[in-house]
Swiss-Prot record:
Belongs to the thioredoxin family. Residues 1-105 form the Thioredoxin domain. The keyword Transport applies. This is Thioredoxin. GO terms for biological process: cell redox homeostasis.
Length: 105
């Protein structure tokens, strides 16, 4: 399952020991809707290695502008509270796993 993030809980959520993959999305965004089931599957398959979380850009402008999100979906991987990888646009599951292989080892 994926976690829902907001401006209020964002900083706390990304501080943990486990890496957090954050999906910046919006309800009106077609590629974001395509991305949702991929992320659910990814989250279940790799729950022990990475936390998958979603942040609605329309409802959380502060965090969205803090990370300079220009196009969605944007996925950012955080480790120890710091962004270490950014993926922009729809990612099929195989591509997502290949991009994050170092985290999933």
């Amino acid at each position: 399952a994926t976690m829902t993030l907001t401006d209020a809980n964002f900083q706390q959520a990304i501080q943990g020991d486990k890496p957090v993959l954050v999906d910046f999305w919006a309800a009106w965004c077609g590629p974001c809707r395509m991305m949702a089931p991929v992320l659910e599957e990814f989250a279940e398959a790799h729950a022990d290695k990475v936390t998958v979380a979603k942040l609605n850009v329309d409802e959380n402008p502060e965090t969205t502008s803090q990370f300079g999100i220009m196009s969605i979906p944007t996925l950012i991987l955080f480790k120890g509270g710091r962004p270490v990888k950014q993926l922009i646009g729809y990612q099929p599951k195989e591509q997502l796993e290949a991009q994050l292989a170092d985290v999933l080892q």
